[in-house]
């Protein structure tokens, strides 16, 4: 459900909602960053990130020990320096960048299902984390008036 590119997040969310609605089945809204962490087998503190724009990243930190994954931070967007500082504060030992895979997404969805946190298609919402370019430009115009 994101974060990621606006178009990719919209297409992915629409596809999941469509399949869920058509089959009248619950679905799992999975963070791209959590899916990345679930796709890794490394133990320690994981810093998972995706390129957002030049000099910025979407990122989150997770702790994995003995197969258990614990989220340390929520999904964020910020300057690469902010991500690096957060990784250092949490003692990150594993850095995963732009390495999503279907197995990680499936494992994250399976974890949601096992914990009873599936949702219906109307509850799933995209996670953009930042304004679109059109929204940013509109906001700038409104502030100038």
Predicted feature residues:
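DPxDG-like acidic metal-binding loop motif
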Residues: 1-2, 6-27
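Oxyanion-binding and handling regions
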Residues: 28-145
């Amino acid at each position: 459900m994101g974060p990621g590119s606006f178009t990719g997040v919209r297409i992915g969310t629409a596809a999941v909602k469509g399949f869920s609605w058509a089959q009248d089945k619950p679905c799992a809204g999975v963070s791209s960053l959590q899916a990345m962490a679930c796709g890794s087998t490394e133990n320690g503190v994981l810093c998972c990130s995706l390129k957002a724009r030049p000099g910025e990243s979407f990122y989150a930190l997770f702790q994995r020990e003995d197969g258990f994954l614990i989220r340390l931070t929520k999904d964020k967007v910020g300057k690469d320096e902010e991500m690096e500082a957060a990784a250092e504060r949490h003692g990150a030992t594993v850095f995963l960048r732009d390495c999503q895979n279907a197995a990680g997404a499936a494992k994250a969805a399976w974890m949601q299902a096992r914990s009873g946190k599936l949702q219906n298609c109307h509850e799933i919402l995209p996670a953009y984390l930042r304004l679109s370019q059109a929204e940013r430009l509109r906001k700038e115009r409104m502030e100038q008036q």
